[in-house]
Curated annotation (Swiss-Prot):
This is Large ribosomal subunit protein uL30. NCBIfam families: rpmD_bact. It comes from Herpetosiphon aurantiacus (strain ATCC 23779 / DSM 785 / 114-95). One of its GO terms (cellular component) is cytosolic large ribosomal subunit. The keyword Ribosomal protein applies. One of its GO terms (biological process) is translation. Belongs to the universal ribosomal protein uL30 family. It holds the Pfam family Ribosomal_L30.
Length: 62
């Protein structure tokens, strides 16, 4: 899964800020690629208003 940090977490709860950090996102427009697991999907669901998500196949992965 390719996750892009699109909106600042300023003004949101500390739990949501911690979730952004735990996904490895630090700066706006930063992109991380993470495995498609239930844990990662749960974290994305908590901050879905702050990020965009793309499904990435094995051949597209870096």
């Amino acid at each position: 899964m390719r996750i892009t940090y699109k909106k600042s977490s300023i003004g949101y709860s500390q739990a949501q800020k911690d979730t952004v950090r735990s996904l490895g996102l630090r700066k706006l427009n930063q992109v991380v690629e993470l495995p498609d697991t239930p844990v990662v999907r749960g974290m994305i669901f908590k901050i879905k208003h702050l990020v965009t998500v793309e499904e990435v196949t094995a051949t597209e992965a870096k």
